[in-house]
Amino acid sequence: MNYPDIESPPAIFLMGPTASGKSAMALEIARRFPVEIIGVDSAQVYRFMDIGSAKPDKLILSEIPHHLIDLIDPDENYSAARFREDALSVMREITARGRVPLLVGGTMLYFKVLRQGLAALPPADDSVRRALEQQALDKGWPAMHAVLSQLDPVTAGRIQPNDSQRIQRALEVCYLTGKPMSEMLEQQQNADFPFRVFNIALLPGDRSVLHDRISQRFATMLEAGLIDEVRLIREQFHVNGDMPSMRCVGYRQVCMYLDNEISFARMQETGVFATRQLAKRQLTWLRSMSGLQIFDCLENRLARQIIDLIQAQRLFS
């Protein structure tokens, strides 16, 4: 197979909420078709964050290499803009090898930015940020979230009341432009994206079963050594709960436990709750998207159904 001269070579997007079985399904596809997996996960880009991000283990990676994981250390930052640049570069390389990129993950913003590009948001303004930080010191971030709810209810609905970085950025955009950030994101122009995408979404037919999976998943992570993983990362890289890496679901809650802010039982409870909230947001993103081939991630014959559908698309001829 040779795709380099095709104007719009194929790519497969495999999306779904956390604990929906995306990674296992990607392996099934990779064992059946000439694809290469690209991770679309804002936690898996960090080295050493293996357990809490459900990163594929070394045995799987030796069998089926994955792109865009283990890119940076936990004390570094990784943006959606950089993801788009990295992903497009890897996708072109995969296509040049006569294979099809298979993008797998649950970071819906990355999928959106990859297809549509980034909105022309204003750069950070130090004076505005300092003013917002001072207001937050006086009132607290939940109060700042309430202010955002008045100025930009759409964006506020997507942000947790204690997510200081995202609240600050959304308010900053409002103050600098006089417009809600959600409005500016809706107005962004489609960027160049030279691939023909086949979209697959894994959605739960019964959300309570997904919730049970999430509970078991977090318990398994703790049993596998998540607390020690976070402790070692903090010692080696001197990161705290405010760093982007440690704001990832699961890591944030363990940081709070290690800082003696919450008990072990409370850490378990909030870790599961935060993961369920993440799944809820992911499902909201997916239900707003069009052109999806939707499958019940709880279906017993899921792998066979998806493989048959991919085969019928003639992506590899």
From Swiss-Prot:
Substrate binds at residues 18-23. It is an enzyme of class 2 (transferase). Its EC number is 2.5.1.75. The keyword Endoplasmic reticulum does not apply. It catalyses: adenosine(37) in tRNA + dimethylallyl diphosphate = N(6)-dimethylallyladenosine(37) in tRNA + diphosphate. The keyword ATP-binding applies. InterPro entries: Dimethylallyltransferase, IPT, P-loop_NTPase. The record marks 107, 129 as: Interaction with substrate tRNA. Keywords: ATP-binding, Magnesium, Nucleotide-binding, Transferase, tRNA processing. Residues 41-44, 165-169, 247-252 are annotated as: Interaction with substrate tRNA. One of its GO terms (molecular function) is ATP binding. ATP binds at residues 16-23. Catalyzes the transfer of a dimethylallyl group onto the adenine at position 37 in tRNAs that read codons beginning with uridine, leading to the formation of N6-(dimethylallyl)adenosine (i(6)A). This is tRNA dimethylallyltransferase. It comes from Nitrosomonas europaea (strain ATCC 19718 / CIP 103999 / KCTC 2705 / NBRC 14298). The gene is miaA.
